[in-house]
Amino acid sequence: MKEGGAPIAPGAPIARRMRGAVLGRRAAWWEAPGRGGAPLVLLHGSGTDAAMLAWGEAVPALAGPRAVLAPELPGYGGTATLRRPYSVPRLGAWAAAFIRERCGGPVDLGGSSMGGAAALWVALEHPHLVRRLILVSTYGLGGAARRPRLAYAASRLPISLPVMGALAASERLTRRVLSEVYADPARISADVVARSRRAALTQARTGAFRAFVRAETGREHFRTDLSGRLRELAMPVLLVHGLRDRVIPASAARRAAEAAPRARLVLLDTGHLPAREDPAGFNAALAGFLDG
């Protein structure tokens, strides 16, 4: 049993850490085997996130009928960072290269927050690579996210790397930051705090999160807004969002579900991280979409 209390079925496929190259540079990812069919690729979010911190419950639960791959995105978990700017198009191009080089063909593609924006970009720019699309608490759907001016200012001051170092050093501060993205702070386990602190230490070294915020924030708004292109999506789309998301409001997902021609919307009683806060509900939603 892992974070959130969702049991992992006996005999569930074990995810193994893999290393290789994407676009000729160092890459790491987690992979659980499957019996065939299109693999599922899951892209994690930003900040103190990482592949198996985001998807640790989902990977073994969804693998078996299909292989599941969860890459460490550039600047996270041992993958070389992107050359600047660290923008959604640059991140999406990396994800498309991962699919081509490591999967060899079309996949079911999902992403959370920053990773959701990258997944959406891939689906729009390289639709031949995406059979089905899963958008979880996704950035880039339009509408107001919180505090663009604050993010803009912070990304341009030399403080974000020391802040990440402070998170890595302080259990109390890390728990306080996580309480902003969890609807129920009681769901923040000691293991999650410890792993988030390790992820913060990585960001203190690589600066990928700061680079992403710097690339994506203007003085008055966030730069990526793909909501006007949602009608271009020909593939089935699943949107999963937390009703109590204080980072990206659920209204953004509702509007996106109305705009995408073949969209399905699942709202869970969580904050910004439904895969962590309600793994049973989240995995059931994805399994129904993928196997239905």
Which role fits each region the language model picked out?
Residues 1-42, 63-66, 103-105, 287, ...:
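Alpha/beta-hydrolase fold catalytic core
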Residues 31-78:
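Conserved HGGG/HGGXW glycine-rich cap/lid loop of the alpha/beta-hydrolase fold
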Residues 69-110, 284:
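Active-site loop/oxyanion-hole signature of alpha/beta-hydrolase fold enzymes
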Residues 124, 132-163:
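Flexible "cap/lid" loop of the alpha/beta hydrolase fold
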Residues 167-229:
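Conserved alpha/beta-hydrolase catalytic His-Asp/Glu region
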Residues 233, 239-241:
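Short beta-strand/loop motif that positions the catalytic acidic residue
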Residues 244-248:
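Acidic catalytic loop of the alpha/beta-hydrolase fold
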Residues 262-292:
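Catalytic active-site module of serine/aspartate enzymes centered on a nucleophile-bearing elbow/loop
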